[in-house]
UniProtKB/Swiss-Prot annotation:
Annotated L-aspartate binding sites: K87, R182, R253
UniProt name for this protein: Aspartate carbamoyltransferase catalytic subunit
GO terms, biological process: 'de novo' pyrimidine nucleobase biosynthetic process; 'de novo' UMP biosynthetic process; amino acid metabolic process
Subunit structure: Heterododecamer (2C3:3R2) of six catalytic PyrB chains organized as two trimers (C3), and six regulatory PyrI chains organized as three dimers (R2).
Biological pathway: Pyrimidine metabolism; UMP biosynthesis via de novo pathway; (S)-dihydroorotate from bicarbonate: step 2/3
Function recorded in the entry: Catalyzes the condensation of carbamoyl phosphate and aspartate to form carbamoyl aspartate and inorganic phosphate, the committed step in the de novo pyrimidine nucleotide biosynthesis pathway.
Name of the encoding gene: pyrB
Top class in the EC scheme: transferase
Domain of life: Bacteria
GO molecular function: amino acid binding; aspartate carbamoyltransferase activity
Catalytic activity entry: carbamoyl phosphate + L-aspartate = N-carbamoyl-L-aspartate + phosphate + H(+)
Organism: Prochlorococcus marinus (strain MIT 9313)
EC number of this enzyme: 2.1.3.2
Entry keyword Transferase: yes
Length: 348
């Protein structure tokens, strides 16, 4: 972990294979130890983590706040409805208010792309040492979700050593609304970095063909890709093409709130063509795990009985794994500024 080089975590395009290994290894150590009640880790004692969520959130916000508290950090939550934004205060001034209060990390979620990056750049220019962690921005990125999905898959394939090597050579199918999904974009960066081949499945209006080249060019603002060899991305139009040979399947929520008018007019037709069921998963040719980043539209992207089948569904496991992954990210960001807390040396 000594090679960690990210003050801010804004996306996964800039992550190297070593970065993924650092996060997954540390998260696995956190997952394997009790850290509630009196046994909280003192790693971030005296630090302040502020969650600035300008979009609704259940899982992500709660998970970050639990993660911070389990590392003994203080937590300050921001709610737009009761803030000075309604009085005309700018988003940057709101962020600076929390910096002035002593925030060490700002976890920022916003409906517009690049807002966390803009805040990070503004704070850097003014010499502030506060770190920014992207909790999801527009259609761009959701790095902690991509990492927890990666860890969930790695742990499923190799419970004792859930590292990037467990993903190498796997065929991972992602079904549904890729166009509007920052989760899908983060998963593309993470999965291909670890050597998985990703198959995207959906209608052209939700899975444009140009996604096949999504990870081929160097990430924006970088001269080269930090990952030497990536897996491939394929786009197909039917589940009959996508599922045979799959090692895992992820389905995505239809984000109707982000869709332009008439982009998708018939939910029943979508379920008929792309909804996952026990019967359809038989096309994989073997038992495979099912993931969904939530929230789930039962009866649209998948059948309710499939979601409740814990021999297949890893959805609740994804939620559980979100806490140790976010603990790992907060710890690594704190370690960027100072030496890691020696209490972690005792973790198995």
């Amino acid at each position: 972990m000594s090679g960690w080089s990210h003050r801010h975590i804004l996306d996964l395009a800039s992550f190297s294979l070593e970065d993924y290994s650092s996060v997954l290894e540390l998260a696995h150590r956190f997952r394997s130890m009790p850290v509630t009640g009196a046994r909280k880790l003192p790693a971030l004692q005296g630090r302040l983590v502020a969650t600035l969520f300008f979009e609704p959130s259940t899982r992500t916000r709660s998970s970050f706040e639990l993660a911070a508290r389990r590392l003994s950090a203080d937590v300050q939550s921001f709610t737009p409805a009761s803030s000075s934004l309604s009085k005309g205060e700018t988003l940057l001034d709101t962020a600076r208010t929390y910096v002035a209060m002593g925030a060490d990390v700002l976890v920022v979620r916003h409906g517009s792309t690049s807002v966390p990056e803009q805040l990070a750049c503004a704070l850097d220019r003014s010499g502030e040492r506060t770190a920014v962690l992207n909790g999801g921005d527009g259609l761009h990125s959701h790095p902690s979700q991509g990492l927890l999905d990666l860890y969930t898959l790695a742990h499923h394939f190799d419970p004792d050593h859930p590292l990037p090597e467990a993903i190498q050579g796997r065929r991972i199918v992602i079904v549904g609304d890729v166009l509007h999904s920052r989760v899908a974009r983060s998963n593309l960066w993470a999965l291909t970095a670890c050597g998985a081949d990703v198959v995207l499945c959906g209608p052209p209006s939700l899975v444009p063909q140009d996604f096949v080249a999504f990870v081929e060019a160097p990430p924006p603002g970088q001269a080269h890709d930090p990952v030497l060899h990536r897996g491939c991305v394929e786009v197909v139009r039917t589940l009959e093409e996508a599922l045979p040979g799959a090692d895992a399947v992820m389905t995505l929520r239809l984000q109707k709130e982000r869709m332009h008018q008439h982009l998708l007019t018939d939910l029943n037709r979508f379920h008929r063509d792309y909804g996952l069921t026990h019967e359809r998963l038989k096309l994989c040719g073997k038992p495979v795990p099912l993931l969904h980043p939530g929230p789930v539209n039962r009866g649209v992207e998948l059948g309710g009985s499939l979601l409740d089948d814990h021999s297949i569904s890893l959805v609740e496991e994804q939620v559980r794994n979100g806490i140790p992954i976010r603990m790992a990210l907060l710890y690594l960001m704190a370690a960027f500024e100072s030496s890691p807390d020696p209490s972690l040396e005792a973790i198995g």
